[in-house]
Amino acid sequence: MTNKTSLSYKDAGVDIDAGNDLVDRIKGVVKQTRRPEVMGGLGGFGALCALPQKYREPILVSGTDGVGTKLRLAMDLKRHDTIGIDLVAMCVNDLVVQGAEPLFFLDYFATGKLDVDTAASVITGIAEGCKQSGCALVGGETAEMPGMYHGDDYDVAGFCVGVVEKSEIIDGSKVTPGDVLVALGASGPHSNGYSLVRKILDVSNTNPEQTSLEGKSLADHLLEPTKIYVKSILSLIEQLDIHAIAHLTGGGFWENIPRVLPQGMQAVIDEASWQWPAVFSWLQHAGNVSRHEMYRTFNCGVGMVVALPAELADKAVELLTASGEKAWKIGVIATATEGAEQVIINP
C-alpha cells in the first residue's frame, strides 16, 4: 500500500529556512572582513577575487586545515565563540610562513541538525580570525546531514588562499650555519595535541572548569584561541631578510622545524631561553608525559620560529615585540654531522 503522506526536506531533517536564517545572521560580520579585491557578496555560486596590483609576479599559496579534537573539548564545554578563530589561524599561519599575504578564506560547517545560534557563533569567530589576519571571508558551505553526526556535534574545516611575490617566497633555502632562531610566543596549546589533552583530563579525572591555573580556569587556558601571527610576520618580512619560518603545529619541535631546514642543517634550541607556560607544565605532570613527547606533541609555548642572519636577530626581537609579540632568541643553526638529528634541544 502506497504511503499518501506528502514528505518534505524538513521532514527528512534538513531545514532550509534555518540555513537561510543563518546566512542573514552572519552577513554583517562577514561584510566586515571585505577586501577591495573581492568582487560581489555572499550568495553567488563562486566567489570572485582579483589579485592585488602591487605584485609583479604573484604566486598563489593555498592551504586547508581543521582544529582537531580541540573542537570536541569546545563542544563538551559548550564554548563555540572562539573555535572559528582557531580555524582561521591554523590556515593563515601556514601561509604566512612562506611569505604569503592571506587574501580570502572559505569555511565548511557540517552538522546533523543545524543549530543557528551555535553556527552563527562559530562563523562569527571565523570572521574575527579573518579580520585579525586581513583576509576576506568570501563564502562557505553549511551542510546539515541527518544521521551523519551524533546529537549537537558538528565539524569545521577552513580553506585559505594567499599571494606572495615570486622573488620573495620564503622556503628555507637561504638558511645557513650561524643563523639565529627567534621564537614567537604561543597563546596556549593552539590547536594541536588535544587528543592527548583530553586523555590527560580523563585519566586524571580533572574538570577543566573547576581547576585553576594562574588565576584562570584550565578550560580557559585550553580553549585560548590560536594566535594569529600574520600581521607581525608580514611586517617583519618587509623590514628584514628572513631565511625561514616554521609554524609549530602537529609534530611539535621535532617535525616542524626540519620542514624548513636544508639538508645538512641543524637547529640547536636552548631550552633555558624560555619557561613553559603553566598549562604545559600541568599537562606534563598530570599525564606523566615525557619531555620528548611534550616537544613532539605540543608547541610548549612557542608558536613560530624564525631563522635569520645573526646580525639581524636583536632587531627582529625588537620589531616583533613592538608588534605585540612575545619574542626571544631561542637557538642557532649549525652544521649537522651525518646521521644527526635536525633538531637538538639542549636543557
UniProtKB/Swiss-Prot annotation:
Keyword Signal tagged: no
Class of enzymatic activity (EC top level): ligase
E.C. numbers: 6.3.3.1
InterPro entries: PurM-like_C_dom (IPR010918), PurM-like_C_sf (IPR036676), PurM-like_N (IPR016188), PurM-like_N_sf (IPR036921), PurM_cligase (IPR004733)
Record field: catalytic activity: 2-formamido-N(1)-(5-O-phospho-beta-D-ribosyl)acetamidine + ATP = 5-amino-1-(5-phospho-beta-D-ribosyl)imidazole + ADP + phosphate + H(+)
Main location: cytoplasm
GO BP, one annotated term: 'de novo' IMP biosynthetic process
Protein name: Phosphoribosylformylglycinamidine cyclo-ligase
Chain segments annotated as transmembrane: none
Pathway: Purine metabolism; IMP biosynthesis via de novo pathway; 5-amino-1-(5-phospho-D-ribosyl)imidazole from N(2)-formyl-N(1)-(5-phospho-D-ribosyl)glycinamide: step 2/2
Keywords linked to the UniProt accession: ATP-binding, Cytoplasm, Ligase, Nucleotide-binding, Purine biosynthesis
Cellular component terms per the entry's GO annotation: cytosol
UniProt-recorded Gene Ontology molecular function terms: ATP binding; phosphoribosylamine-glycine ligase activity; phosphoribosylformylglycinamidine cyclo-ligase activity
